[in-house]
Amino acid sequence: MDFIRLDTADNVVTAASRLPAGHIVETIKTLQPIPSGHKIATAAIPLGGEIRKYAQLIGYASTDIPAGAHVHDHNVSFRNTLSLIHI
């Protein structure tokens, strides 16, 4: 398997190896090359939408993320992360 889905509630999967643009993941095509260990949106995620992995909220879309897109720090916002550092 080229990707790992950790929970059915997730809207991202993790690439198990480097995937080229156009690679089929479930029912969608990757829009760009995806590095091993990075996330791929399995459905469109609107600006501000929740990103879920492990059935847990891991961040919010900082821009509209189309299905098949690479999901990483360039398009994910981690709200309240800074406040946790000071606890």
What annotation goes with each model-predicted range?
Residues 3-81:
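Conserved SET/PR domain catalytic loop and adjacent active-site segment
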Residues 85-87:
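Conserved small/polar residues in nucleotide/adenosyl-binding loops
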